[in-house]
């Protein structure tokens, strides 16, 4: 079957680590605390990414591994237990404590699973302690959420009741809107993972139909299947088309009449089309290069090409689960280069050679590329922004049209990298 050209490369990477996901997870579950076991670098990353004031009481922190810990001269397990006890004594509102591994803790083989088990025995149910890895040694930053949710799956109560389970963190307002729309479709029992309170874990079992809201939850999906749930394969809810197909997959699973689906969703699609028009005028015909970082690249590429008229130079993704992404791959134009993995130097060479109008990349690459005259969009901004659902299609398109509008105001009529070449019409 014709489709995109799937390629693979390996080499040096330029990505954030999984600790970054704590920034949105701690906001999602205000009764949870994320204790990173890592270095001062880990602490600086989380503090900077979250933008928390120094006098605030954040719901995350770092148990810093000292040189004595790293050299094996001190018992890091005893010190970790002491820090956890002091934290829980000072913050009695904590109901779930996540022990989050990092590159340093993995290098010295610190067993956080054992630490969580010891603390659970000691606390006797007063606080639930779970662990997962946020290390960036072999993963990218969004996989931190996959690790956190995968750690919760064994704790979910069992139930055979018929329900729809939305898996993946969404902005509260976006989630409320989607649940409202599912209710209008006749799907009334809708739950979420992660929940808004860490103790209100949704049940799972043979009657559970799972709809992933994010494309980077591979391990969580596998564990939910092992619990008896059915995980639907559908395009992800980015853009109007993807969001509609995503909701239609749930409607089909719950045997909702297609005519009723059309009655509910057609007016929303028309509103989205109108909202997209001013951004499509800017984006249509422009060439975009997506570097791998967030694993949102394939759904974004599909949206930008099919709904905004952009030309895909190359679509990079850190990892490609072909089964989970089958619906997205099927919607990409034939011959589109989809590159799994990264050799950052080679990819930057291809960026310079292809001279795209816009590059989606990590913060570490954005400023150097901007200095070379190449317009960029931070991929991490797409993770923090409320972009899911039909209603958000216009806002999603604006995130890409804004840097091009800004560049045209600064250099009207000029190509981003070749001043003697006109901007694509």
Curated annotation (Swiss-Prot):
Cofactor: how bound: Binds 1 [4Fe-4S] cluster per heterodimer. The cluster is bound at the heterodimer interface by residues from both subunits.
Xref: InterPro entries: LIPOR_BchN/ChlN, Nase/OxRdtase_comp1, Protochl_reductN
Gene3D superfamilies linked to this entry: Nitrogenase molybdenum iron protein domain (3.40.50.1980)
Keyword ATP-binding assigned: yes
Catalysed reactions, semicolon-separated: chlorophyllide a + oxidized 2[4Fe-4S]-[ferredoxin] + 2 ADP + 2 phosphate = protochlorophyllide a + reduced 2[4Fe-4S]-[ferredoxin] + 2 ATP + 2 H2O
Keyword Iron: yes
One Pfam assignment: Oxidored_nitro
Residues annotated to bind [4Fe-4S] cluster: 17, 42, 103
Keywords of the record: 4Fe-4S, ATP-binding, Chlorophyll biosynthesis, Iron, Iron-sulfur, Metal-binding, Nucleotide-binding, Oxidoreductase, Photosynthesis
GO terms of molecular function: 4 iron, 4 sulfur cluster binding; ATP binding; metal ion binding; oxidoreductase activity, acting on iron-sulfur proteins as donors; oxidoreductase activity, acting on the CH-CH group of donors, iron-sulfur protein as acceptor
Enzyme Commission (EC) number: 1.3.7.7
Paired cysteines (S-S): none
Main enzyme class: oxidoreductase
Essential cofactor(s): [4Fe-4S] cluster
Gene Ontology terms: biological process: light-independent chlorophyll biosynthetic process; photosynthesis, dark reaction
Family assignment from sequence similarity: Belongs to the BchN/ChlN family.
Subunit structure: Protochlorophyllide reductase is composed of three subunits; ChlL, ChlN and ChlB. Forms a heterotetramer of two ChlB and two ChlN subunits.
PANTHER family: LIGHT-INDEPENDENT PROTOCHLOROPHYLLIDE REDUCTASE SUBUNIT N
The protein's role, per its UniProt record: Component of the dark-operative protochlorophyllide reductase (DPOR) that uses Mg-ATP and reduced ferredoxin to reduce ring D of protochlorophyllide (Pchlide) to form chlorophyllide a (Chlide). This reaction is light-independent. The NB-protein (ChlN-ChlB) is the catalytic component of the complex.
NCBIfam families, per database record: DPOR_bchN, PRK02842.1
Identification of the protein by name: Light-independent protochlorophyllide reductase subunit N
Taxonomy of the source species: Bacteria, Bacillati, Cyanobacteriota, Cyanophyceae, Synechococcales
Gene name of this polypeptide: chlN
